[in-house]
Amino acid sequence: MKFLDFFRANKKPSTASVAKERLQIIVAHERGQRSTPDYLPALQKELVEVIRKYVNIGNDDVHVALENDGSCSILELNITLPDR
């Protein structure tokens, strides 16, 4: 009987293999969207604390971004300072 099963075209994949494939797709998608490192929010918080020692700013006045350009990583820091 197994010999005849080889020629059948209506083979359905098992539910476990389908679930595994879907999970791999979801994990790969989430990894692609999580391009920012885990330390970036903590870095932004510490930068705000240091800048507050000298200038009165809010939490939303500091923006930190990390760009990966091939073999080079660029850390971009934008600070909105209040008018004097």
From Swiss-Prot:
Q: Does the keyword Signal apply?
A: no
Output the InterPro entries linked to this UniProt entry: MinE, MinE_sf
Could you list this entry's UniProt keywords, alphabetically sorted. Answer: Cell cycle, Cell division
| GO annotation, biological process | cell division; regulation of division septum assembly
| UniProt entry tagged with the keyword Nuclease | no
- Xref: Gene3D superfamilies: Cell division topological specificity factor MinE (3.30.1070.10)
Extract the SUPFAM superfamilies matched here. Cell division protein MinE topological specificity domain
Stored Pfam families: MinE
Q: What does this protein do?
A: Prevents the cell division inhibition by proteins MinC and MinD at internal division sites while permitting inhibition at polar sites. This ensures cell division at the proper site by restricting the formation of a division septum at the midpoint of the long axis of the cell.
By sequence similarity, the record places it as follows: Belongs to the MinE family.
Name this polypeptide is given? Cell division topological specificity factor
> Which species does this protein come from?
Pseudomonas fluorescens (strain SBW25)
